[in-house]
Amino acid sequence: MADEGLDYSILFNKDLPPPGGRFQGHPKYNFIGGHHDAELQPMDGFIESAANVFRGDPRNISMYSFEGPQGILPLRRFLADKLAKHRGINITPEEVLITSGSGQAIELINEVLLDEGDTVIVEKFSFAGALTYLRRRKINIIGVDLDQDGLRMDELAQVLGDLKSKGIRPKYIYTIPTLQNPTGTVLTMERRHKLLALSQEYGVPIFEDECYADLIFEGEYENAIRSLDDSNRVLHIGSFSKTLGPGIRLGYIAADWEVMCRLLTRKTDAGTGVMDQMIVADYFTNHYEKHILNVRAGLRRKCDALTAALREHFGPTVEVEQPRGGMYLWVKLPEGVDCRQFVGPAMQEGIAFNPGPDWSADPEAAANYIRLCFALPTEAEIWEGIEKLARVFQLDGGKA
């Protein structure tokens, strides 16, 4: 009798999410995720930097974490300089930990701070990955409303007061203050100061995620919340994946040693890829300013194209706020429309979009929202894809 093999279904972790499907290729009109524009990738510069790296010290490749577990010094030094110049954060390279993307940065902080059943405050609409991590840990997630100026401090104060009256102290306030994901808002400086004051009053740290802060379309914006902090209340993270591309899995955490020494005990991957670190350090040390100006200009053109396409093909039935930068538009559909029913029909037309519920502390509160990433598709694909998407919503009973 033939061996039928082992039935793994009886062995799987009982808390696993539903199984994933096989990769079927990318859709023609790809508005999901944090994909970047291939035309903006500085391949010649990467080739030059890679050549410089391969002529360097072979011990960086032959040893685990040759320059220590926090990452290579040239990249940490570049980050410390960049954060001081562009975000107002004065730290030393010893206060920087290089991570394998910002997702690892988030999970390392969760590992250090969270226990099952803890409470965390987030923005009402927030990064889907961060929300997923929290739900897997069985964390009580409380969403606080945003407006055009970012997280509302009046509502945050109310939530903190209510929790305190119940004897609950949140482990942190997770915020994306600069080009918020998914809404694109920028927290005003007045609110940044107020957020710090509330952190001090209630003894709750701030978890500041600035993955998109490089992507302002023009000028500069408010300094990071971490730059205002003189009492170790702010944990700050960022990423190279949005400045270069998600194929570069590099992020970072800026934290004081009291937290850093704990983070290092939870980073069990034997070190973030050294080759990526070395190439990015070499390239950005010499080309960062020119590169980021080129990226901002390219993203702005695509943002303008997507906004115009939505207005032409959806008309006044959708609400769209023009962001000051970033990679996304947060689109509000008419009340009563559930975007989830259009995911399948859209995919049949080669169109992929992110359903709003994935980006909300309360999924049902975002049923009539979609998030569109404009970085990857060409301007022609943006116009074609949005025209087709409008037809999908109309043909399948949507009000758009």
Where are these regions (language model features)?
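Conserved PLP-binding catalytic core of the aspartate aminotransferase-like
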Residues: T317-G350
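PLP-dependent aminotransferase class I/II
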Residues: R233-E312, E319-P323
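Conserved core of the PLP fold type I
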Residues: N60-Y202, F207, A213-S231, L299, ...
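PLP-dependent enzyme catalytic core of the Aspartate aminotransferase-like
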Residues: M1, Q348, P363-A400
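Short hydrophobic/aromatic beta-strand micro-patches
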Residues: A254, W330-K332, C373-A375
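Active-site glycine-centered loops adjacent to acidic/histidine catalytic or metal-binding residues
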Residues: D209, G356
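N-terminal small-domain helix-loop-helix segment of the aminotransferase-like
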Residues: S9-S100, F284-N286, A352, L395-A400
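Short, solvent-exposed loop/turn elements at beta->coil junctions and helix N-caps
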Residues: F240, T317, P357-A361
